[in-house]
Each structure stands twice: as structure tokens, then as C-alpha cells.
Design a protein with these regions (language model features):
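The conserved cystathionine-beta-synthase
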Residues: 462-483, 490, 507-512, 530-557, ...
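Bateman (tandem CBS) regulatory domains
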Residues: 447-461, 466-473, 504, 516-528, ...
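Alpha-helical transmembrane segments and immediately membrane-proximal extracytoplasmic
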Residues: 1-448, 452-458, 462-474, 484-486, ...
Length: 592
């Protein structure tokens, strides 16, 4: 009998990373994806400005328009209502994938859609977002741009023969390019892709995403501008206990994140109880947005100018309080309705407003500094991406001095949210659709352990010279050693000749055999799957699945002599052992 064994078990073939020349192909494709993402970001910004000017100022212009100091008439309440009605119609008759803030939809495409996004999403998502935001929706442009950039990356990938994992890489690359073009934060965009979208840390995905983000930052001076989006130069010199104060700000930000997320999904549940089709929900939310705009126009639209004012320390306490309350209410009500908009800018604005309020009781630092720290902490806690939020704040402002304060605040906020909430604002939506995912990256024990660590030995085997009648008697008697469904068969030298099971014996009994026929003769020269002691457990498990076998004989690589056996239960024990090591708490060193 011939043996089918792994050719990948040798240490000479093992590497830290599973990269190959496909990495270069994906990196080349990412050059195009980065360009797509950058231009998509520019297009969406212009569309938002066009709709804003047309809806509020009755001017057909693509130049950026702010609503912060607009003098709105009571009739302006109907502008967000009309915008919500149009978005609802697009969602129902165009594509329901435009609903939401973009990132959960991109995650769903990655997890269950094999990283395929429909072409119409690339059209309707930016258009619906421009209408929603341009008519006063209290959203950022980054979520829709991430979804649009991801859609373009996915569509581009579908023109080539790529695997689902490779399409995922280009989807994330397009998303990173869109975020980079808006904010000028390539490193944070790459980290966002890693912390939230890719679900892996591999050169295959990391390098193309970096390429795409760098291409986008190269386009940015011509499309958006070369300067940091929000300039900041007010970082104080922290006393030794200053980082503790930053941690306290982070804890408050974590509580704010938990409250905001809980409120969002509570309001969404109330919408679902309404006797109205979801198409009408954005229009209904538009009424609340319109009233909020009359109270504080600064809460409407993208609000990048408000973020700059908060960071610059130009917002008074009462204005920050009004902005926080109005922005939080209209954002939660509007986003829960299923309209199209982003989360990053609103989170930054609400976090910054709380930071301004905190600055009046904290012992050092201006309101702009604490607004910036609180912004990053709220972002890191709500999205559960503390590294992204930290680097994002530094790149966004161009102020490296804030790094220690930001990272401790983001870590504290992250710790609070993971302890208080089961899921983030991104994953809760997926969980409600029956999709659970985890963001914990650990070393796979199947990749670390070798077959020798889990194989059963010594092994009870049947000899090839055993007669068929004797073999049948072995399976029928149920002797003490006979407690498995299948057994290896070995020749006189101990080399594996095959595997024989109860099912085989039943089939052969029906077929009949010659009186003098042996097991070895019956097995003949058919191929048998074997493993080697030095093989990785993961490799062996993959081959067992492919061959649909439950037990594999383990042989010495050079001699072919049987030395062990691996069954499915041995593989399950590997997972059980990993869980046991995670849960065990042992004192390794004595204190005295």
C-alpha cells in the first residue's frame, strides 16, 4: 500500500509568515485601489458640499459650506426630513446596503459575503450619504467613504482571479485609502484596517493596505490639501501625576462610549416597534434633526470646523454643553433610523465637547488639550481600536507631544468599554443579525504543536498476514484491546500497509473472500494517509479534513515504521488544552 504523507513538515520549509509572490501582485493592485479610494473621498466631499449649499443656501456650488453659524428659519426643519425621505427611498429601491454607517456593512461583506460588494453599493452609498449629510444629517463622511473605498476595492478585485482573502485585502486597502484621503492619517488608516477589518496580521494584507494608504496620501495635496486636518500646538508639560489624570479622562470617555452605544441600540429597538416600514424612519428622524438644528446649528452636518474650534480652545463651556446634548440626541436618533452616515466625526465632536467641560475642573492644561484627549479616548473606546485612536490623534493634529497622554486615555477608555459592554458599536449590529465575531488575536495551538505532542502511542495494530477470517473475528469478539472503529495494518517490518475499520469488514463480508486471503492482500496497493511526528498538528488536521478520515497512522519519515496514531479526539484535546492554559492561574514563583 502506498502512503500519502505531508511534504511540509520539515523545519526547513517553515517560516514566520506565509508570504509568497502573490504579495507583489496584491501590492500592484493596491496602487490602483489607493487611487480609487482617494478620488472617491474627494468626490463624496464635493457631493456633500454641493447638497449643503443647495439645500441651505440655495447656491449650486461644490465649495465647502459650514452650518455652524447659519441663521435657520423654522421651515428649515423640513430639509432633513426631505433628505431622510430620499435616503429611505434609495435604501428600499436602490440598495439596502446603504443603511448604516458603513463599517459594519464592510465587516459583513468580509465575514459572510466572501469580500464581494455589489457594484450598485459603490454608487448608492456615496450618493445617499451626500444627501443625508448635506441636508443636515449629523454625520461624518469617513464611514461612507470607508464603505465606498472598500466597495471600489472589492469591485476592482472581482475583475481578477483572486481568493476571498485576497479580495478582503483590497477591500480593506480601498477603505484605508478613503480614510487617508479625508484625514491625512495613513498610519491610523492602516491600523484601523488591522484592528477592525482584516481579522489577521499577515504580510499578504498588511503590505497592500500600506501601499494603498501611501498612494492616497500622495494624492491628498492635490485633492484635499497637504496640511493636517486639525492643527494643534497646545500640549502642556505634564507633571508626574498627569498621566493619572489622563487615565481618569479615559475612564469618563469609556463611560460616555458605553452610554452612547447603549442609547443608539435602544433607540433602534424603538424604531422596530413602529408600525411603519423602515423606509420612513430616516424621514421621521429628520424631524428631530431639524428641531435640533434650530436649537444649535453647529450640530448639523459634518462639523469639521467645530472639531477644529474644540481643539483650538475656542468653544465656551455653555456652547460645548449645548453642542454635546444636541449632537448626541440627533446623532443617536438619526443613525438608529438606518440612514446613511459616519461615526468618526460625531464621536470626535461629542468627546471633544466633554473634554471642554472637563477642562474647567482639571488642574492643568487648556480646554483644547483636554478636548483632543477626550476625542481620541471616546473614539478608541466606542470603536474599540485604541491604537488607531492614539495614532489618529497624533497624525490628525501633527502634534507628537500628545502621544503619552492620548495612549493612556485610550487604553483606559478601551478597558472600561470591554468590561462594561459585550460588543462595540460596530459588532453589536452584526450580533443582532446573528453574526458573532471576536477581535482577540492569539497564537493558534495547531500551528505551534507537533504531531508527536498529541499522538497516541504505543499503537495496537493488526498484522498484514492476519487472515480475513481472523480479522473478522477480531472485530466481532469485542476483546479488551478492540475498542476503536479502525486500526492500522502493518507488515512484518512494522511499516503501515493500510487502515481497516468495522465498516470495511462488513462490506468485505458481503462481498466474500478467499479462505486463504490475508488483510495485506485485501488492502492491496491503495493509498493511505499517514503523518509524521514532526508535522504540525494544523497540517495534519487539514489533510484529515480533505481526505475525510478520522484516524491517521503516524510513521517515521525515513523508515516508515508505525510509531503512533492521531484521531479526531486528539485534535479536540489540543483545543481543550489551550483553553485550560488560558483559565489556569498558577503561582510560578514563591515570594519567600
Amino acid at each position: 500500500m502506498k502512503s500519502s504523507a505531508s511534504t511540509h513538515g520539515s523545519n526547513d520549509t517553515l517560516r514566520d509568515f506565509t508570504a509568497d509572490r502573490r504579495l507583489l501582485v496584491l501590492s500592484a493592485l493596491a496602487l490602483v485601489t489607493g487611487t480609487f479610494g482617494a478620488w472617491a473621498a474627494w468626490t463624496l466631499l464635493k457631493l456633500i458640499a454641493l447638497v449643503t449649499n443647495l439645500a441651505y443656501y440655495h447656491v449650486l456650488s461644490p465649495h465647502t459650506a459650514s452650518l455652524s453659524h447659519a441663521h435657520l428659519a423654522p421651515s428649515s426643519i423640513m430639509i432633513p426630513v426631505i433628505g431622510g425621505l430620499i435616503v429611505g427611498l434609495i435604501g428600499r429601491y436602490g440598495s439596502n446596503k446603504i443603511r448604516g454607517h458603513g463599517i459594519p456593512e464592510a465587516l459583513e461583506a468580509i465575514l459572510i459575503g466572501q469580500s464581494r460588494i455589489e457594484p450598485k453599493v459603490a454608487l448608492w452609498k456615496p450618493l445617499s450619504s451626500a444627501i443625508a449629510i448635506g441636508t443636515g444629517g449629523p454625520f461624518g463622511a469617513e464611514g461612507p467613504i470607508i464603505m465606498t473605498g472598500g466597495a471600489l476595492g472589492s469591485l476592482f478585485a472581482q475583475f481578477f482571479r483572486l481568493s476571498a482573502a485576497e479580495r478582503k485585502t483590497l477591500l480593506a486597502a480601498g477603505a484605508a485609502a478613503g480614510m487617508t484621503a479625508i484625514f491625512g492619517t495613513p498610519v491610523a488608516a492602516v491600523l484601523l484596517a488591522i484592528e477592525i477589518m482584516l481579522f489577521e496580521w499577515k504580510p499578504r494584507s498588511f503590505v497592500p493596505v500600506v501601499v494603498s494608504a501611501v498612494v492616497a496620501i500622495a494624492w491628498r495635496p492635490w485633492l484635499v490639501g497637504a496640511w493636517p486636518l486639525f492643527a494643534h500646538r497646545g500640549a502642556p508639560v505634564l507633571p508626574w501625576w498627569g498621566l493619572l489624570v489622563c487615565a481618569l479622562v479615559g475612564v469618563i470617555a469609556g463611560l460616555q462610549s458605553a452610554l452612547t452605544t447603549g442609547a443608539l441600540y435602544w433607540v433602534e429597538e424603538q424604531y422596530e416597534k413602529l408600525p411603519l416600514h423602515w423606509m420612513w424612519w430616516p424621514a421621521l428622524a429628520g424631524l428631530v434633526v431639524g428641531v435640533g438644528g434650530l436649537i444649535d446649528p453647529a450640530a448639523l452636518g459634518v462639523g469639521y470646523d467645530n472639531i477644529q474650534a474644540l481643539i483650538s480652545g475656542n468653544v465656551l463651556m455653555h456652547a460645548a454643553l449645548a453642542l454635546l446634548i444636541v449632537k448626541a440626541i440627533i446623532w443617536v436618533v438619526s443613525l438608529a433610523s438606518g440612514t446613511s452616515g459616519g461615526t468618526l466625526a460625531p464621536l470626535l465632536m461629542m468627546g471633544g465637547a466633554v473634554g471642554v467641560l472637563e477642562a474647567h475642573v482639571l488642574p492643568f492644561g487648556g480646554s483644547g488639550f483636554w478636548a483632543l484627549i477626550a476625542m481620541a479616548a471616546v473614539l478608541g473606546g466606542t470603536l474599540r481600536c485604541p491604537l488607531t485612536a492614539t495614532v489618529f490623534a497624533v497624525e490628525l493634529t501633527g502634534d507628537l507631544r500628545i502621544m503619552p497622554a492620548v495612549i493612556i486615555a485610550c487604553a483606559a477608555s478601551f478597558a472600561v468599554t470591554v468590561l462594561l459592554m459585550r460588543r462595540s458599536i460596530l459588532t453589536e449590529r452584526l450580533a443582532r443579525r446573528g453574526r458573532h465575531l471576536t477581535y482577540e488575536y492569539t497564537v493558534d495551538p495547531f500551528e505551534v504543536m507537533r504531531v508527536r505532542d498529541i499522538m497516541a502511542h504505543p499503537v495496537h495494530a493488526l498484522v498484514a498476514s492476519l487472515s480475513m477470517t481472523g480479522a473478522r473475528a477480531f472485530f466481532e469478539t469485542g476483546s479488551g484491546v478492540q475498542r476503536h472503529r479502525s486500526y492500522p495494518v502493518v507488515d512484518d517490518a512494522g511499516r503501515v500497509a493500510g487502515m481497516v475499520s468495522r465498516a470495511d469488514m462488513l462490506r468485505w463480508s458481503r462481498e466474500g473472500w478467499r479462505d486463504v486471503e490475508t488483510l495485506g492482500e485485501r488492502l492491496g496497493s491503495a493509498e493511505v494517509l499517514v503523518g509524521h511526528p514532526e508535522d504540525r498538528v494544523g497540517d495534519l488536521a487539514d489533510r484529515m479534513i480533505a481526505a475525510d478520515v478520522g484516524r491517521v497512522p503516524i510513521v517515521e519519515r525515513t523508515s516508515g515504521v508505525l510509531v503512533g496514531l492521531v484521531a479526531r479526539r486528539d485534535l479536540l484535546r489540543v483545543r481543550a488544552l489551550a483553553g485550560q492554559l488560558e483559565r489556569e492561574r498558577a503561582q510560578l514563583m514563591s515570594l519567600y
